[in-house]
Swiss-Prot record:
Subunit details: Associates with the 50S ribosomal subunit.
Binding site residues for GTP 1: 15-22, 62-66, 124-127
Name used for this protein in its record: GTPase Der
Signal peptide residue numbers: none
UniProt cross-references to PROSITE patterns, sorted A to Z: G_ENGA (PS51712)
Organism: Rickettsia bellii (strain OSU 85-389)
GO MF: GTP binding
Stated role: GTPase that plays an essential role in the late steps of ribosome biogenesis.
UniProt record, GO biological process: ribosome biogenesis
A UniProt-annotated Pfam family: MMR_HSR1
Gene: der
Top-level taxonomy: Bacteria, Pseudomonadati, Pseudomonadota, Alphaproteobacteria, Rickettsiales
Length: 452
């Protein structure tokens, strides 16, 4: 079974008046097709357009705002919304972060969920950093995203949630469920100058597509190459070598470095290329930390392995793994491969590792399994008693997003949870759910509810 998006999908924007449906409609259609006004209820009919986020194209429906209204006009507006829901493959259920959850939001969410359609809760008007309040979970949606339709922020996260929720379609040629088929896996190759990034890509695609040579810094801007690997659409992105900021003086190199850093922001997976003759410098660790902080998945590749003496390879690996696991705890267990791009040794293993870690990066864990694990783990190693004999407890957790896996944990006193205890939970989760090498994010929320 393979997740493939073959026919153009239909997405309906549903919500009460003035939550920003028409603004998002205009944003996704790339042109102004819907009238937008602060006055509620401007939209009265279903409107259709071709929408797009990145390379993903779909049909989009704007619907009238729902209000509990028994008169015939209100019923006719609701009929428009009902028809849109019936037509849609996916519902974007929109709410307004400024006003919070209102009774009409709850009524409409109950109505929408009766149709058992894939749905994403879209929390609009989030111009500033937004923390998902537990009130939003009461609407009953297991997928949610914060955006600003007016300013265009959160569109990448919206894309991720939509793709994850769209129905799967059978593919006769597929043997296993593979979440990247039908999508484009963007792989950025990053590292210090002269680590062999361009040589690696040339070897992978079996073409001298990129200029290479012994001189450091040949690549000055990010180069994208579309490629197919085992039936998967791959976009390989070669980037300029990244030196320490203090050593960068020329304006052109500053632009190249900025371009390379920007490419990492939009990557799915980053290959960190390291020169075996000059392994694990501070700049390598800086790049890896930046990738983890951006929430990207990472694969570490040690190139020029053919230049290391056979008698020294075992000791090299032991020291290398020790340094990686002690200096990069945020991606503990990250895969490391040892290759020779020049001799095309082990280069296919790199792509297999990228696909595997991409699946881990996309992993979704059910709430029941999470809390079964949480109860066992916190009972095995509880937090110490506080003054007065009261114990800090982590009572409940849920996964709020993937890419990277992000979790919300409810506690009676979250400010007392130490960094070391969080590391204990994260490391335990990696082992329990087989999640090596990807950033795992925990967000703690204070709750006084004894049942949550």
């Amino acid at each position: 079974m393979t997740k493939k998006i073959i026919a153009k999908k239909i997405i309906a924007l549903v919500g009460r008046p003035n939550v920003g449906k028409s603004t998002l409609f205009n944003r996704l259609s790339m042109r102004k097709k819907a009238i937008v006004h602060d006055l509620p209820g401007v939209t009265r009919d279903r409107k259709y357009t071709d929408g797009r986020i990145g390379s993903f194209e779909f049909s989009l429906i704007d619907t009238p705002g729902f209000e509990e209204n028994p008169d015939s006009f209100g019923k006719r507006l609701m009929e428009q919304t009902t028809k849109a829901i019936n037509e849609a493959d996916l519902i974007c259920f929109m709410v307004d972060s400024r006003s919070g959850i209102l009774p009409d939001d709850k009524l409409l969410s109950d109505f929408v969920r009766k149709y058992n359609k894939p749905a994403v809760l879209v929390i609009n008007k989030c111009e500033k950093a937004f923390d998902f309040d537990k009130e939003y979970y009461k609407l009953g949606f297991d997928s949610m995203v914060a955006i600003s339709a007016e300013h265009g922020t959160g569109m990448i996260d919206l894309y991720d949630e939509i793709i994850a929720k769209l129905p799967e379609e059978d593919s006769a040629e597929a043997e296993i469920h593979d979440p990247i088929k039908g999508d484009c896996l963007q792989i950025v190759v990053s590292g210090r100058p002269n680590a062999g990034k361009s040589t690696f890509i040339n070897a992978l695609i079996n073409d001298e597509r990129l200029l290479t040579g012994p001189e450091a810094g040949i690549t000055r801007e990010s180069i994208e190459i579309d490629w197919q690997y085992k039936g998967n659409h791959i976009k390989l992105i070669d980037t300029a070598g990244l030196r320490k900021k203090a050593t960068i003086t020329e304006s052109l190199e500053k632009l190249s470095a900025s371009d390379a850093i920007n490419s990492i922001k939009f990557a799915n997976t980053v290959i960190l290329m390291i020169d075996a003759l000059s392994p694990l410098k501070q700049q390598d660790l800086n790049i890896a930390s930046h990738v983890a902080n951006e929430g990207r998945s990472i694969v570490i590749v040690v190139n020029k392995w053919d230049l290391i003496k056979e008698s020294e390879k075992e000791a090299f690996k032991e020291e290398f793994y020790y340094q990686i696991n002690t200096t990069l705890p945020q991606v503990k267990g990250v895969p490391a491969l040892f290759i020779s791009a020049k001799n095309k040794q082990n280069i296919a293993d790199v792509l297999d590792s990228c696909i595997k870690i991409y699946k881990t990066w996309n992993k979704k864990i059910t709430t029941s399994k999470l809390n079964e694990w949480l109860n066992f783990t916190t009972e095995a190693h509880p937090l110490p008693l506080q003054k007065g004999g009261k114990r800090v407890r982590v009572k409940y957790m849920t996964q709020t997003k993937t890419r990277p896996p992000t979790f919300k944990l409810f506690s009676n006193n979250p400010e007392k949870i130490t960094d070391s205890y969080t590391r204990y939970l994260v490391n335990n989760m990696r082992e329990a759910f087989d999640m090596p090498g990807v950033p795992i994010r925990f967000n703690y929320i204070k709750t006084k509810n004894p049942y949550v």
